[in-house]
From Swiss-Prot:
Keywords: ATP-binding, Glutamine amidotransferase, Ligase, Magnesium, Metal-binding, Nucleotide-binding, Pyrimidine biosynthesis. This is CTP synthase. Its EC number is 6.3.4.2. Pathway: Pyrimidine metabolism; CTP biosynthesis via de novo pathway; CTP from UDP: step 2/2. UTP binds at residues 13, 188-193, 224. It comes from the Bacteria. CTPSs have evolved a hybrid strategy for distinguishing between UTP and CTP. The overlapping regions of the product feedback inhibitory and substrate sites recognize a common feature in both compounds, the triphosphate moiety. To differentiate isosteric substrate and product pyrimidine rings, an additional pocket far from the expected kinase/ligase catalytic site, specifically recognizes the cytosine and ribose portions of the product inhibitor. GO terms for biological process: 'de novo' CTP biosynthetic process; pyrimidine nucleobase biosynthetic process. ATP binds at residues 14-19, 71. It comes from Synechococcus sp. (strain CC9902). GO terms for cellular component: cytosol. It is an enzyme of class 6 (ligase). Allosterically activated by GTP, when glutamine is the substrate; GTP has no effect on the reaction when ammonia is the substrate. The allosteric effector GTP functions by stabilizing the protein conformation that binds the tetrahedral intermediate(s) formed during glutamine hydrolysis. Inhibited by the product CTP, via allosteric rather than competitive inhibition.
Length: 549
């Protein structure tokens, strides 16, 4: 039977509950326990698929095609365990389910209320994750902050959950902030005390407190917090600001988080093996020479909009003993200032996914610059589509070529709507989503990078390469290096004679892991390193033995 851990947050939002949940998952897994983590989000959207990246950050796609919160990306990267649509729950999806049941007569004419119907549906979702995952421990992160009206049904549900499984089978963790007041020169505990008081008023007594701070927490302060909040001193776990999120599991392990949780759950505290993780953090903190990578996008004002892309680049740099020098480049700014002005000196260019017209011309200009300057390039989803448009306009003699998404009346729709999308009206959850196989062509860059004939990648798109133009592209020097198994859908393209130029219709960033970088990202960083002044390839170029065509 599974055990359950519930993680709440207080004092401020964005306090790091997701990283705490992911870190605890990593620590439990290092002791041999199977873990699944789910997120309860208190917004009324059914899922974040149609939400603006400026408001929500990236949409993380699971293997089974769910559009979810970016925290699920943290869960997967830290635990190296695939999550599913069951691991993402929103208030909107709960209400939708309950209302649908009411319409079907499932409640036998009863009055449908928040308690017990909404809270009961929430509890059922948590039990479902336990049953389907086979996990020893199910960790649940409750979004929002204690005191928010939106979170109340979720908090009531996890209070009721105690009656479902028994007190020895669940643990409550509360993440709070200890602010430092400069004038008094001390960390203040009052916000934490009030947050715990609010949680207690709902009927939840936390077993463990994770206290965020920017400096060391003294033993006296831990005793004070423990005394006022009703938890043992040893269960007050410091969580100091870290230089990298991958160091957080090590900090929490040192503070005793996993030990305390296992004690509450009455589980054996097996010996932990965090050797590989510690080495990973060491390598991250002691990198080799830096590579300059330009990320050209339309949402660069909010870094979380491309979170998995950035993490995938970091993973590749760790594996290649490189330091990531990431440059955020606004695609619209390229349209006004020119690609060379903003990209000169870059060792690699990445154009990630996105939707809509805004910034597309800037992305196309960036891709042309990378192609002509022979700078390593990787395009993702819309990044592949814009690479196709760039080639069509500048190399294939189709100056009016574009995507049907951008101009439905274009005479040359080199990117067009997927056939199965023709009659789709709703936006939410209707794209080509989730894992699909991709057949890799032999003797290509992709073949060298993957080393496999068939790979499985996660997708999120409505548009595809228009096969009416495939012959024209192949004749002009394009290489289709990956397709769907039936050969119809173009999944991966590359250019001959370029140091590294490839783009894919899928999202490889979702499969990258700290200790196992995705082959496309690792290949990009490896190619970027060849441009560094002391690389063998650069030395040969400097001697004039390699000339640019």
């Amino acid at each position: 039977m599974a055990k359950f851990v519930f993680i709440t947050g207080g004092v401020v939002s964005s306090i790091g509950k997701g990283i705490v949940a992911a870190s605890l998952g990593r620590l439990l897994k290092s002791r041999g326990y199977n873990v699944s983590i789910l997120k309860l989000d208190p917004y009324l959207n059914v899922d974040p698929g149609t939400m603006s990246p400026f408001q929500h950050g990236e949409v993380f796609v699971t293997e089974d095609g769910a559009e979810t919160d970016l925290d699920l990306g943290h869960y997967e990267r830290f635990t190296d365990t695939a999550m599913s649509r069951l691991n993402s729950v929103t208030t909107g999806s709960i209400y939708q389910s309950v209302i649908n049941k009411e319409r079907r007569g499932a409640y036998n004419g009863g009055t449908v209320q928040v308690i017990p119907h909404i809270t009961g549906e929430i509890r059922e979702r948590i039990h479902r994750v336990a049953a389907n995952s086979g996990a020893d421990v199910v960790i649940t992160e409750i979004g929002g902050t204690v005191g928010d009206i939106e979170s109340l049904p979720f908090l009531e549900a996890i209070r009721e959950f105690r009656g479902d499984v028994g007190r020895q089978d669940l643990a409550y963790i509360h993440v709070t902030l200890l602010p430092f007041i400069g004038t008094s020169g001390e960390l203040k505990t009052k916000p934490t005390q009030h947050s715990v008081k609010e949680l207690r008023s709902i009927g939840i007594q936390p077993d463990v407190l994770v206290c965020r701070s920017d400096r060391e927490i003294s033993e006296d302060l831990k005793r004070k917090i423990g005394g006022f909040c009703g938890v043992p001193n040893r269960a007050v776990i410091p969580s100091l600001d870290a230089d990298t999120i991958y160091a957080v599991p090590l900090t929490l392990e040192e503070g005793g988080l996993c030990r305390e949780v296992l004690d509450v759950l009455q589980l054996t505290d097996h010996e932990s093996d965090m050797t590989a993780w510690s080495q990973l953090v060491h390598n991250l903190r002691n990198p080799g020479p830096s590579v300059k990578v330009a990320l050209v996008g339309k949402y660069v004002q909010l870094n979380d909009a491309y979170l998995s892309v950035v993490e995938a680049l970091r993973h590749a740099c760790i594996a290649q003993d490189a330091s990531l020098d990431l440059h955020w480049v606004c695609a619209e700014q390229i349209e006004t200032e020119g690609a060379d002005a903003l990209l000169r000196g870059m060792d690699a260019v990445v154009v990630p996914g996105g939707f809509g017209n805004r910034g597309v011309d800037g992305k196309i200009a960036a891709i042309r610059w990378a192609r002509e300057q022979r700078v390593p390039f990787l395009g993702l989803c819309l990044g592949m589509q814009t690479a196709v448009i760039e080639w069509a306009r500048n190399q294939a003699g189709l100056p009016e070529a574009t995507s049907e998404e951008l101009d439905p009346g274009t005479p040359h729709p080199v990117i067009h709507l997927l056939p199965e999308q023709q009659d789709v009206v709703d936006l939410g959850g209707t794209m080509r989503l989730g894992v699909y196989p991709c057949r890799i062509a032999p003797d290509t860059l992709a073949d060298r990078l993957y080393g496999e004939q068939v790979v499985y990648e996660r997708h999120r798109h409505r548009f595809e390469f228009n096969n009416a133009y495939r012959s024209l592209f192949l004749e002009a020097g394009y290489v289709v290096s990956g397709t769907s198994p039936d050969g119809r859908l173009v999944e991966l393209i590359e250019l001959k004679g370029h140091p590294f130029f490839t783009a894919c219709q899928y999202h490889p960033e979702f499969l990258s892991r700290p200790g196992r970088p995705h082959p496309l990202f690792r290949g990009l960083i490896e190619a970027a390193q060849q441009r560094l002044p002391d690389s063998p390839a650069q030395a040969i170029r400097n001697q004039g033995e390699v000339t640019t065509p």
